[in-house]
UniProtKB/Swiss-Prot annotation:
Its main location: membrane. The keyword Lipid biosynthesis does not apply. It is found in: Membrane. This is Transmembrane protein 269. One of its GO terms (cellular component) is membrane. The lineage of its organism: Eukaryota, Metazoa, Chordata, Craniata, Vertebrata. Keywords: Membrane, Transmembrane, Transmembrane helix.
Length: 254
C-alpha cells in the first residue's frame, strides 16, 4: 500500500535534505563573503591609485606655480605609495581591468608628466627634454604591458626614475642643469632593456621592509635634505645594483 514504508528511512531522507540545504547555504555564504572581501580590496587598491594620481596632479600644479619644493615632495609620497599598491596587487593576485587602467594612468600622470615638469619649460632645451621624458615613460609603460615580463621589469621602472629626479631637485634646490643631466640619464635607463627585479619590498626580506618604513618615517618626520638623500640612495642602489641587492630574497609564489 501507498504511504507505508520504513519510518527510519523516511526520517533519514529528511535529515539528508536538511544537511544538503545547510551545506548549500554555507557554501553560498562563504562565496559571497569571499567576493565581498575581494571587492573591498579592489576598492582599496583603486582608492590608493586615485590618491597617487591626485598627488601627481598637485605636483603638476606646484610646478606651474614654480614651487618645485612642494612638487618634489608630492612625487616622493607617490613613490612610496606606488610601492604599496604594487605589492598589494601582486600579493593579493587581484586581476581587475579597471584598476589596472586607473593605476597605469596614475603612473603616467605622476611619474611621467609631473616628473618631467620638474625640469621646467622655460627654455627650448628644457621643454624638449621634458617632452622626451614623457614619451620615454609612455614607451616604457607600453613595452612592459605588452612584453609579458614575469621575472622582473624590462627597463628602469618609472617610479624610481621619478624618485631620482625629485630627490635631486630637493638636494640641488631645483638646479636646472643638474636636473637635465639626471633626466637624460634616467631616460637612458628607461629605454635600456635591462632587467630589474620586481620591487615587492613589503613581501620580501625584513631589511627591505625596514628600508621602506624608514622612507615613510623620514618623509613625514624629518627635514627634507635628509629624506631626499635617503630616497636618492635607495633609488640609485636599485638602479646600479638591481640583482645583487634587490634581486635576492624575494619570495616566489607557487
Amino acid at each position: 500500500m501507498l504511504g507505508t514504508g520504513d519510518p527510519n528511512l523516511h526520517s533519514s531522507c529528511i535529515l539528508s535534505r536538511k544537511k544538503g540545504r545547510q551545506g548549500h547555504h554555507i557554501m553560498k555564504h562563504e562565496q559571497i563573503g569571499s567576493q565581498m572581501t575581494e571587492f573591498s580590496w579592489k576598492d582599496i587598491i583603486n582608492a590608493l591609485a586615485l590618491a597617487n594620481m591626485i598627488l601627481g596632479l598637485f605636483s603638476i600644479f606646484c610646478s606651474f606655480s614654480r614651487k618645485s619644493y612642494c612638487a618634489s615632495w608630492m612625487l616622493l609620497i607617490s613613490f612610496l605609495l606606488d610601492i604599496a599598491i604594487g605589492t598589494m596587487t601582486k600579493h593579493l593576485n587581484i586581476p581587475h581591468k579597471l584598476g589596472l587602467e586607473l593605476n597605469d594612468f596614475a603612473i603616467f600622470t605622476t611619474f611621467g608628466l609631473a616628473s618631467a615638469l620638474l625640469l621646467g619649460v622655460d627654455g627650448p632645451l628644457n621643454g624638449f627634454l621634458a617632452i622626451i621624458y614623457v614619451l620615454t615613460t609612455s614607451f616604457r609603460m607600453c613595452f612592459y604591458s605588452t612584453g609579458g615580463a614575469t621575472s622582473g621589469y624590462k627597463g628602469l621602472p618609472c617610479p624610481y626614475a621619478s624618485c631620482v629626479l625629485a630627490s635631486t631637485c630637493l638636494l640641488t634646490k631645483g638646479n636646472t642643469f643638474i636636473l637635465c643631466c639626471m633626466a637624460s640619464l634616467m631616460i637612458l635607463f628607461m629605454i635600456d632593456q635591462s632587467c630589474y627585479p620586481h620591487d615587492e619590498i613589503l613581501d620580501s626580506d625584513n631589511w627591505k621592509k625596514i628600508v621602506y618604513i624608514g622612507g615613510v618615517i623620514l618623509l613625514f618626520f624629518s627635514p627634507f635634505p635628509l629624506t631626499a638623500f635617503y630616497c636618492l640612495t635607495w633609488s640609485l642602489s636599485y638602479i646600479f645594483s638591481p640583482e645583487t641587492l634587490w634581486g635576492r630574497g624575494v619570495r616566489i609564489k607557487p
